[in-house]
Amino acid sequence: MNFVPQLPRQVALILLLQFTNSLGVSALVPMMSFFIVEGLKAEPWQIGLYSGLVMPLTLAVNRWAGERLDNHFPVKRLLIVSVLAYITLSALLTQVTSLLILLVLIAPLMSLSNMGAGVVFTFGRLYAEQQGMDVARVNSWLRMMVSLAWMIGPAVSFSVVARFGFVSAFLSAFGIGIVYLTLWYIVIPSGFRSTRERRKTTGREPINWGLQIAGLTCLGFVITNSLFVSAMPLFFVHETGLPGATPGLSLSVKCLLEVFVIFGSVRLAERIGTRQVLMLAACLAAISMVLFAQVTALWQALAISVLEGVYYGLFAGVAISFVQSYAPDRPGRATAVYMNSLFLGGMIGSVSMGFIASATSFQTVLYTAAFSAVTALFVLIATLKVQPKAVDGSV
């Protein structure tokens, strides 16, 4: 971790901005299903109404934000939309008493809040380019901030709920929002925007198949992770009979390894190539899922969690740079494709897990997760000839 003192002040502030954004989002997003059932006393199936509304709105908003950034819209003016949406929804959640209000007010605000990470990722890339910095390394640092925040946010949020209630948790999120607003004001220069010139096209813009394939590859990894995380607690405790602390310990080991591997993934990519790193990650993902399906003891689960942390750290460290490389003159759109693959993959994994487990078993869910990783590997191999575009290439 000796890279921290070497960071320029502005880069360190951008990382802090991303950490604060992710901390705030992670403090609310995982808790919403729990709040719907326990706080609003709604039926569990009604969680799907909320998720089914937030997800498409988030995908659309991410795409919209990416287009604005690529069209030289000021980063600061765009990000304030996300910041204010987060602060407003945190305050409103302290007063929400019905599912209808949640769907009408909170869901749209949550989608606007969710676009913040993508905007900061694009901001970090644009700043790195304009300063002549290593873009892949800056991307990995930004992704590391997201992982660190998600290690902290949900745990703290659920702890506050358990001890003080939902209102206190939402007020804590509101406090994070105020810090987020302060950093927005300090970190982002008022006139900062993309300086890239886009190639002029006549008629309808052609489809960037390389970018779509890169996004599809990320989708396979995220579905693998989402299927496993959704099924893991019930598989370990109910189907396998492991101690109740196993899921939490396993996740802690995975997250710890993930953070360190993210930092090293860029160096590995410099040696063997980004696509090769993703191919290695896909192999490790498939192997770890199959091994998890065979565990019978706590030590086995923790040992395989090390492998899981390595695969996900490799993926997380290079994925955004891999996607952005297929649209170098459209970093906003590329980042939107990356972020949408995360949201969409998470939704597909969590929803399909329930259907698969109900029809078969949680062990089958893990085998399905392995299959998703193999699919990502197949896409990477089958598209070896689809190379990233040059900076001045067409979109």
Question: Over which residues does each language-model region extend?
Answer:
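Helix-loop boundary and gating motifs at the non-cytosolic
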Residues: 2-55, 225-239
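Hydrophobic core of transmembrane alpha-helices in multi-pass small-molecule transporters
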Residues: 19, 100-116, 219, 300-314
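Central cavity-lining transmembrane alpha-helices of secondary-active solute carriers
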Residues: 49-67, 252-264
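Helix-to-loop junctions at the C-terminal end of transmembrane segments
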Residues: 61-74, 161, 261-273, 357
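Structural signature of the two symmetry-related core transmembrane helices
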Residues: 77-91, 174, 276-291
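C-terminal transmembrane helical hairpin of 12-TM major facilitator-type secondary transporters
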Residues: 275-319
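A late C-terminal transmembrane helix in Major Facilitator Superfamily
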Residues: 329-359
